[in-house]
From Swiss-Prot:
Single GO MF descriptor: ATP binding
Lineage: Bacteria, Pseudomonadati, Thermodesulfobacteriota, Desulfuromonadia, Geobacterales
Keyword Cytoplasm included in the entry's annotation: no
GO-annotated cellular components: plasma membrane
Annotated InterPro entries: LpxK, P-loop_NTPase
Pfam family of the protein (one): LpxK
Species: Geobacter sp. (strain M21)
Involved pathway(s): Glycolipid biosynthesis; lipid IV(A) biosynthesis; lipid IV(A) from (3R)-3-hydroxytetradecanoyl-[acyl-carrier-protein] and UDP-N-acetyl-alpha-D-glucosamine: step 6/6
Official protein name in the record: Tetraacyldisaccharide 4'-kinase
Keywords, in A-Z order: ATP-binding, Kinase, Lipid A biosynthesis, Lipid biosynthesis, Lipid metabolism, Nucleotide-binding, Transferase
Amino acid sequence: MADLESYFKDLMDGKRAGWKDRLALAGLRLASLPYALALRFRALGYASGIIPSHRLPRPVISVGNVTLGGTGKTPTVAWIASYLIGRGKRVAVLSRGYGGSAEGRLRIVSDGNNLLVGPEEAGDEPCLLARKVPGLMVVTGADRYRAGVLALKKLNPDVFILDDGFQHLKLKRDLNLLLLDCRRPFGNERVLPAGYLREPKGAIERADLVLFTRCQPESAPQLADLAKPACRSLHRLNGCVPLQGGEPLAFSDLKGERCMAFAGIADPAGFFDGLEKEGVQLVTTLAFSDHICYGDAEIAAVLRLKKASRSAFMVTTEKDAVKLAPFMDQLGTVYVAQLDLELLDAPLLQEMLDRLLTAGKARPLQPENDGNKRA
């Protein structure tokens, strides 16, 4: 399966030039046409009210993207949640719970004080958010409206954050944030299955704010064609902490040491590159599929590679770390890199959030058959 995924990725990136490859790519591009058309009709159906969408009685902030792979949604959600909690608000994240055994089912993952469901059931990202942001409530469910209703009944939040919500048009939002990777905002600019776009580029019109992620401080993305408010952010790796608990470690403390890194995230190469930019000497790396459910086979592979590479230290991501607790004794010392989001244009997003909180008044809970016009 991994080899097949790699092949299609090479096709989309133009790294395969044989006649069979060109034929396969032509087939993918042909298949993308009805897919893109269906997505346009779907969006039009929600916008016109033909397909019903529902509104929660508290403000909803959606954070999402239009491309496959990681654009930094989790650190962005964590930043927004921390900001709102700092303003004294009770915040609940609504997530699907990708990768968990209960994916799509209604679950209260965190009540803001306690983690009630583990990553095996709830998925890695909901549990990571619950642990990373003190006071954050997290609810999972395929139907985010129903998840929001459950949160209202049990947790009484003041505001919702819809995680990975750009395509979840069934739930109306009051602020629609679209994340674009500064390095390659629209991938190869083709829709699935011929490219990385989850829907046509025109979907950007639904966004209230475009947030470019993984920018460099000196970078200036081309914003003129967007005709949308936009701001920039960058990801910072701020040292690491032992998985087993203990004092944090600066990356400079690893200078000159043989290290290996492993990760099961959407963009493992970006994580490995980030470590090397911080001066970590990576002698080997191991990439698993996104949302990997770690078991004995995966842990054995990590340990074999550590031994073969004679690595003194192992480093992984926060997202992986939430799933490694059962294997701490086998793994020994593993360092967890701390990833934070730095907003280069923070006042613009803060102003939008503050305006939403000021204007956001409680609304009556609408019945599910209501079809309002704003999606």
